[in-house]
Amino acid sequence: MQDGRIKIYKKPKPAHKMKFTFPEGTTAVMGHTRLTTQGNQKFNFNNHPFYGKADKEFAFAHNGVLYNDKALRKEKHLPKTHIETDSYVAVQLIEKQGKLNFESLKNMAEDVQGNFTFTILDQYNTLCFVKGSSPMFLIYFEQLGLFAYASTESIMSKAMKKSGLNGYRYSRILLSEGDILSIDRNGKTELSAFETFSFQNDFRYPDGYDSHEELLLEMCGCFGVPEDDIIQLLDYGYTADDIEEMLMDSEMLEETISDIKEMNEYEDLWEYGEKIH
């Protein structure tokens, strides 16, 4: 926020290389590290957060993948855009309604199909969460009057250690799929809901994978990585966060997969040796 207007700073580079300072008087900040699935990240307009404007300005970020963005553009007669990502259709659905409120967020969430958790920050420093099947970890530091969120608990834990927040007590705010939560600049919270789309729950991978792991299995093809490789990593105890980092570092991913395959080959040879003896 600067002079009552939303200001978005983003670059097509790793988050740890980003350097910026907060404007004086800042009370709310949202950030996003993109795992690219659609739209070249080298073109900065494809990166999150996105700028939107309805009855107020807002910044919008999405964790997940939408499957019906092209169909919605035709069905809802949305304007043409140079932005290539599936996520941006959600911004356009809000803008088309002309308002940013619980009703417009509900309508948008019920129109899109896929995996998502959306975060929206408006020009009055109200932050909204629209919780779909994608993971989210939200906490509140009462002593500091501070809300903080990340996609997973492990990512939050790392951020807290680096920022020094791990020295403070906090409580977790649990949101279920279908919840919409708003937090205004004074910390007042309001809760609403939307109807979840049954397609999100029609298909499940075997062996009880959670929603974050299923999302990685669905997205891995965008990186040219076979599902079998992701399943092997999960079977060997790598977490969804570990695998997400590997997808953004192809050398690390290839090396890890190669090591696992070598171990499997060694185990097969050992079992064969046992049998012939």
Task: Say what each PLM segment does.
Residues 1-277:
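Conserved short alpha-helical segments that host acidic/polar catalytic motifs at enzyme active sites
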